From Swiss-Prot:
InterPro entries: DUF520, UPF0234-like_C, UPF0234_N, YajQ-like_sf. It comes from Coxiella burnetii (strain CbuK_Q154). Keywords: Nucleotide-binding. GO terms for cellular component: cytosol. This is Nucleotide-binding protein CbuK_1936. PANTHER family: UPF0234 PROTEIN YAJQ (PTHR30476:SF0). The keyword Nucleotide-binding applies.
Length: 160
């Protein structure tokens, strides 16, 4: 039976490259000279440090531009609240990866509401969709691309 997987993965190497490029741009920009503004990439988060809230907003914009240039979907980013102290400001950007249970259930409900002859099952952080006809699977992919789920989705392991 034909099947495919729905997932939301993040290319860590590209994220690291985007953060390095953003650090280089902040180091060379005139409005950031001497401010000590930096990005720190650790695991599933990026920590932004600057002197003011305004600089943090500029740094987020720079990071989003670098993500876009590296073909990383900006929807992977979730901004935490900034921590602003006397002469420093800090903000954490969480990187979302994988499909959580609530999003997986929402995806399965969307598929079942279409009454197509396919089955969808949650497998860890992926959703596997199987069906008898390849056309049904392609219509599921089209449906999910149109819907607003809140996660960037990738479709892979398409097997006949």
């Amino acid at each position: 039976m034909p099947s495919f997987d729905i997932q939301s993965e993040l290319n860590k190497h590209e994220v690291s490259n985007a953060v390095d490029q953003a650090n280089r741009e902040v180091a060379t920009r005139f409005d950031f000279k001497g401010s000590g503004a930096t990005y720190k990439y650790e695991g599933n988060s990026i920590t932004l440090q600057a002197e003011t809230d305004f600089q943090l907003k500029q740094m987020i914009d720079i990071l989003q531009n670098k993500f876009a240039k590296r073909q990383i979907d900006v929807a992977h980013m979730r901004l935490e609240d900034p921590i602003i102290q006397h002469k420093s400001a800090q903000q954490t950007v969480m990187l979302l990866e994988g499909i959580d249970q609530t999003a997986a259930k929402k995806i399965i409900k969307l598929i079942k509401d279409q009454k197509l002859k396919v089955q969808a099952a949650i497998q860890g952080e992926k959703v596997r969709v199987t069906g008898k006809k390849r056309d049904d699977l392609q219509s599921v992919i089209g449906l999910l691309k149109e819907q607003e789920i809140g996660l960037p989705l990738q479709f892979d392991n398409f097997r006949d």
